[in-house]
Design a protein with these regions (language model features):
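Alpha/beta-hydrolase
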Residues: 1-128
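Short beta-strand/loop motif that positions the catalytic acidic residue
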Residues: 202-204
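Small-residue-rich helix-loop
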Residues: 99-179
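Extracytoplasmic/secreted envelope proteins and their assembly/folding machinery
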Residues: 65, 185-188
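Loop/turn elements at helix/coil->beta-strand transitions in domains of secreted/extracellular proteins
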Residues: 196-199
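Acidic catalytic loop of the alpha/beta-hydrolase fold
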Residues: 207-208
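Catalytic cores of eukaryotic secretory-pathway lumenal/extracellular enzymes that build
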Residues: 2-27, 152-184, 191-194
Length: 208
């Protein structure tokens, strides 16, 4: 259990899209319509429910679990045992548990055949990373060398290889910081106001 409520809210529409793709939820509806339905539930029902926490009645908890099951394709009883909070690695492991497969985190359409079917999360890593990482890294290095003429005296490390050691605190060491979801919007906004020519690309797919 972790207490970053924001993560449960931001992940839910992508979980719904991924469940739709794997035919575990939303069948008979278009992807766009189903994801929009999930977003509306997230904004109007799920967010207030998470903030109510233990003040929710048993009936309300049951209703939320039922809707979550509808959107993300997991068993309602499992969702209730999870206190209506599904951690991403558990979703990756459980959505296709009946097939012994884990799904990707970077891209939920990818699947990996798992040897350990009862682990809490994918035990081989992220299927969408280990299935594309070699090709992605090779293409990126080729682009750097042949198109950008960048000369490197050491191997280029992809983000997946170093991400686990990333320092997430947005303030210098020793400065007070109240733990919270990572939010760099303030710093980014300040930088863009100082540099009015700066352009920012935000890219995220339905299944990311």
């Amino acid at each position: 259990m972790h207490d970053n409520i924001t993560s449960y809210l931001t992940y839910l529409p992508s979980m719904a899209a991924t469940a739709w793709y794997h035919k575990k939820a939303g069948q008979g509806k278009t992807l766009e319509a189903f994801v929009e339905e999930a977003r509306n539930f997230t904004y109007n029902t799920y967010a207030p429910a998470l903030y109510k926490g233990s003040l929710l009645s048993a009936s309300e908890q049951n209703s939320i679990a039922e809707k979550l099951s509808y959107f993300i394709g997991l068993d309602k009883a499992y969702i209730l045992r999870s206190n209506n909070r599904i951690l991403m690695h558990r979703f990756q492991k459980n959505l296709l548990a009946d097939k012994g497969l884990a799904i990707g985190r970077l891209d939920g359409r990818f699947m990996g055949d798992e040897a350990d079917d009862v682990s809490e999360g994918p035990n081989l890593g992220d299927p969408s990373s280990y299935q594309i990482e070699a090709a992605y890294t090779a293409a990126l290095n080729h682009y750097f060398a042949e198109t950008l003429n960048v000369e490197m005296d050491r191997p280029y490390m992809t983000s997946g290889q170093i991400g686990g050691k990333w320092r997430w605190k947005p303030v210098p060491d020793g400065q007070y910081w109240e733990p919270m979801p990572v939010n760099t919007a303030g710093q980014l906004g300040e930088t863009m106001r100082r540099n009015t020519e700066m352009k920012v690309l935000v890219a995220s797919g339905y299944y990311d």
